[in-house]
Amino acid sequence: MRLLNSVCKVIASSFTGVPVHIEEVPDDFERGCFYVFLTTGSTELKNFVTYQDNPIFQIVYFGERNEADQVIAENLYEVKETLKRLFVLSMVMPVLPAEGVTEKSRYAKIESYSDEMRISEGAIYARLALNFTEDIPSAQEEYELMGDVD
């Protein structure tokens, strides 16, 4: 969920005022919005304390239509170029900090990005593959003090 929220934050910060839906699109959604969800993912254990997540996210942008219910293609091209700039040219994506943990800034490597524009649907379908290495959370060991040092 941390990486999904991070992808949504990157999109929301560049498309101010455009809704970003996670997991499902509401029945009464209005066009001019994003829908982001995890399509596939794998996790690989690197060693005893580190693992690597390799999620693939689907980003769908539903473009606005005019009064005649026709797609405004120019807006689709602008969104397509902005998404490409966000997820290709930067090569890394900032990751939100884990809940309740103070840590330095973390980044996920962008492995690949592809998109398909469907003018007939008035939508852009993009796939984003990430690579993120994370420490395995360890349980705090409970112990008693042997005594006070004088």
Language model regions located:
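Short acidic low-complexity segments
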Residues: 21-31
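A short, hydrophobic beta-strand-centered structural micro-motif
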Residues: 30-40
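Charged, amphipathic alpha-helical segments and their flanking helix caps
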Residues: 1-21, 42-150
